[in-house]
A protein has these predicted regions:
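Flavin-dependent oxidoreductases
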Residues: 183-273, 289, 293
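Glycine-rich FAD pyrophosphate-binding loop
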Residues: 21-40
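Dinucleotide-binding Rossmann-like beta1-alpha1 core, especially the glycine-rich loop
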Residues: 43-122
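Residue-level detector of alpha-helix initiation sites
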Residues: 9-10, 33, 353
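C-terminal catalytic lobe of FAD-dependent flavoproteins
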Residues: 266-268, 274-280, 286-372
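N-terminal Rossmann-like FAD-binding beta1-loop-alpha1 element of flavoenzymes
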Residues: 2-27
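Helix-loop-beta segment of a Rossmann-like dinucleotide-binding subdomain
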Residues: 76-88, 113, 120-158, 284-288, ...
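A conserved short coil-to-beta-strand element within the FAD-binding core of flavoproteins
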Residues: 162-176
């Protein structure tokens, strides 16, 4: 079968991967010369521990298996099973972590509460004051800025994959698509993985879909002269991941409100060390459109302050700052919007902040549902 994937981000690339793995011929079209959306503007986290019970957790766990398998085949994606530590610094945060590890599914998620000395033994770079840490051995990381090109190089070597950038698909045809150069590309099946681009062709074919857009701000430092053996989160991350909900989190929210900047920008701290030693740090969440086009300085000052307090030292100079927009299903409990929009076409979008984590498993399910 000839499969045409519209969209060059990680979700589209994983659909191409799944189709090629099943022996099909794939053409992947991207309107930019390279992916420029959320797929290259994120942490590269494969984040399992904080996922909601049920479909979301199962999808993340399956995706974690697939990422490890892909990492063995394509070392260039930078997969490493480094785990994560959510650093707890107050009694209320410690109560949340204690509540979570006491639940029946804690071991299945890879969660364990560590004492301060155990935290520093696991990740000596965490030199700040702390009461402990929630360790998730299931979490992992990849390199978001190079993962898609590395995957494409592997796919190209199969002889059954073609990459066509700089083309915007303008029309869905009974046997393929037409692009903005006027060229027609034949296909038995079209998979639209267009990310946060929900207008134009997507709106024309699918109408209004139950997906909203979310804007974030992040940054990256110069290389740190120390190795972080895990990804790192602060206690504010408990507020943003469904696995941590419960009476202890209610008490945290009531008695330990976020700082004004963190609350205004709906912030948590996540920190991942890249393979070159630099640190990717974020992030903010903005939900109300039209989004501002400014990159605000206050969130960055907050992130620097929190990161330095966790590390117990000054950060290296900030190398770059950026904003990004991703698509999220309007129902937070729904992993992705997947819909058949024509006899020969599916739309797959809106995984939200779980897109980098879950994309391999989302794609695997799509190709099964589409009969590949």
């Amino acid at each position: 079968m000839r499969v045409l994937v519209v969209g060059g981000g990680v979700l589209g690339t994983m659909h191409a991967w799944q189709a090629v793995q099943r022996g099909h011929e794939v053409l992947q079209i991207e309107r930019e010369q390279e992916a420029r959306g959320a797929s290259v503007r994120n942490f590269g986290l494969v984040w399992v521990g904080g996922r909601a019970s049920g479909e979301e957790l199962a999808t993340a766990q399956r995706a974690r298996e697939l990422w490890e398998e892909i990492g063995r085949q394509v070392p260039g994606v930078g997969f490493r099973a480094n785990g994560s530590l959510t650093v707890v610094r107050t009694e209320l945060e410690l109560a949340v972590a204690s509540d979570v590890v006491a639940r029946p599914d804690a071991a299945d998620r890879g969660l364990k509460l560590l004492a301060p000395n155990e935290v520093r033994l696991l990740n000596p770079a965490l030199g700040g004051s702390l009461l402990g840490g929630l360790h998730c051995s299931s979490d992992a990381a990849v390199e978001p800025r190079v993962a898609q090109p590395a995957l494409r190089q592997h796919l190209l070597a199969t002889g059954r994959y073609t990459w066509l950038p700089g083309r915007e698909v303008r029309a869905l045809l009974p046997q393929g698509v037409r692009d903005d150069h006027g060229d027609v590309h034949s296909a038995d099946l079209v998979l639209l993985c267009t990310g946060a681009a929900l207008g134009g062709l997507v709106r024309e074919i699918a109408g209004e879909v139950p997906v909203r857009r979310v804007r974030l701000q992040m940054m990256q430092t110069d290389p740190l002269d120390a190795r972080l053996t895990t990804s790192v989160a602060d206690g504010d991350s408990f507020r943003y991941y469904p696995a941590y909900r419960g009476s202890a989190l209610v008490a945290l929210n009531q008695s330990q409100p976020q700082s004004s900047v963190a609350s205004e920008h709906r912030m948590q701290l996540l920190l991942v060390q890249r393979l070159d030693g630099s640190l990717t740090i974020g992030d903010t969440h903005e939900y109300d459109e039209p989004f501002t086009f400014d990159v605000d300085s206050a969130p960055y000052e907050h992130l620097v302050s929190v990161a330095e307090s966790l590390l117990g030292r000054a950060l290296p100079p900030i190398r770059r700052r950026w904003a990004g927009v991703y698509a999220q299903h309007a129902d937070p409990g729904t992993v992705v919007h997947r819909a058949r929009i024509a006899d020969n076409a599916w739309l797959v979008t809106g995984p939200g902040g779980r897109g980098m984590t879950c994309s391999p498993a989302i794609a695997e399910r799509t190709v099964v549902e589409a009969g590949l």
